[in-house]
């Protein structure tokens, strides 16, 4: 007793002594183990070895006490084990003492039970129970060993279900070690083996410790059951949607069912679609009545809506997307509900035969425009005026006059835009049949088709059937295009048709006449030239013919030049060109048709080149004179063509009103022949510097006075119109022509001077060869050569500055730079 008390006193706490003086200290060491919970956790691992002898009994004793006191279950176990082990060791030393010691711990265990919470039990009743319990324990010791194993299993369960039994078992546990200590270890071995199996079950307990899995699984299962209960009703509604039965009320019901679900996923539309399905078979009949009533009231409205939409169908895209417009509006507008109800009526009609007929009659009206038969679709497209491009994306009201008005406005704008540049484009149109094809710059090729002729917008105007806007445009463009029409080769053939006036028609007939001798003019050009022949022949009969200056001697040529008031020219070709120009300016082009034919025969290279296409005569004259050095025919034809537009500019103001109106009226007929007639660049391969500059090309498409246009034609520079020549003193027309030709003559003189220069060597190429090789021309050196030697070869007394040469080079696309 004393030894046991000493052990208990060491581990006891003074606070709990008053409850039971001998027992409380035994309970306190358990609290000390409570202070170290990690020791309690490994203790069950150690249990197989420790329980092998006596610890199992102590466990049974402890388990029963903490079962009532859940707070101190684990801590009470190890201290009792220690006390039992000490008592067992002492019992082994002396067999008489263990009975007493067994009694004392039993009383202690009873006090522990009273401490753990059994306040109703008295300390006196406890010893009585212990006596009865001792006898029972002695009777069944082996059974108690098995029971201990059973209690261990119960310990693994530790649910606290049985609390009254453990106090009795504890008393028996204390008595059992006293009876048979040697036999208990054998039974303890068996119990340890069983304990090992029970440890596996403990691991299962630990798996069960995670409450979230059990709770989530249970809640999900319960929610799934609820959803399953809701699904049988909503499943039919899903099928109803496949039948295009859309009910706003059904949707709201389904949403409510989705809200009942525990998880948010029940609210997802996909889950809602499942919920829709079950309601159809169950409440399909009820829904049918509501649907039919709603559909009968709302069916006329969707009929009106497609009509509104059809009014907007003016484009291909609207036609194609017409069948999908209802679906798009259903989601956004309240009208969608009406359309859906009509569809639902059609679906419900399938279930009921009588309703099917009524709904089928109302529904086919929608698919008529939604889905058309191939024939009906083709007819609808044929009846519709289609606009392609960006306009097809626009929705406009269907009006038969709107498209016509649009076309009329476009035609007027095209006529208005084309009327001004038309003479330029006609003059710049090149015939693919010309003898000489020159390498053209990128900007000159840009505005031409595959055949080399200019792309013209007048053809687009011809396609329009409305002649009235053309008349309006011609009248408005008369004032603007007076000079343009005078300079354009398109106008001259038109004027001789309508008005056979003395000089202007003669001058304008010349380009067509020149176009005939061209080696291979187009068919339309031949027709125009034939018409011009009849008109020009009438005028040319009374007028003298141009003499063949090629047959004159140098002395005769110099006299003729002096007669026109020009200084003597050294170069024979230059004199012939000058005389031809002067004679044409004096007598008119109408007489030069035959003489030009003769001169072209005598000339080395006859060409229909830019003559017809040169409304800007001042520019083309110098260019053609430059070409005449290599080809006399070019220079001869060029002077003929150059003065007539100039004379037209002089003479047309007098008769411009009479001549221009008829010419404008005849424009739509003539432009195509002009395109074939005009050869934009009739220049040899060596004359690439005369290619049109980008500035000229811009001027081609912008109507300008003849002075600015002189830069536009392929052959001439911008600067040619600025310098007039006062050499022609015999007639005002000659003076005006020479004034306009003076600067072009200077540019042509520069061009001629380059060709007059003898061919250079590879080490020192001529200026013309440098230009052909795209070598940069140093302006100072070029000006020095022209002023000292080059212009002298041509008989030009004037001098040229570097700035002028820079403009001259830039106008022809020649690479130049300052030193």
From Swiss-Prot:
Residues 681-690 have a biased composition (Acidic residues). Residues 83-95, 212-237, 313-329, 337-351, 532-541, 592-620, 650-668, 729-741 have a biased composition (Polar residues). One of its GO terms (cellular component) is Slx1-Slx4 complex. InterPro entries: Slx4_ascomycetes (IPR027784), Structure-sp_endonuc_su_Slx4 (IPR018574). Residues 352-362, 621-633 have a biased composition (Basic residues). Phosphorylated in response to DNA damage. Residues 36-49 have a biased composition (Low complexity). Its main location: nucleus. The keyword Nucleotidyltransferase does not apply. Residues 1-187, 208-371, 467-553, 591-741 are annotated as: Disordered. Regulatory subunit of the slx1-slx4 structure-specific endonuclease that resolves DNA secondary structures generated during DNA repair and recombination. Has endonuclease activity towards branched DNA substrates, introducing single-strand cuts in duplex DNA close to junctions with ss-DNA. HAMAP family: Endonuc_su_Slx4 (MF_03110). Forms a heterodimer with slx1. Belongs to the SLX4 family. This is Structure-specific endonuclease subunit slx4. It comes from Aspergillus flavus (strain ATCC 200026 / FGSC A1120 / IAM 13836 / NRRL 3357 / JCM 12722 / SRRC 167).
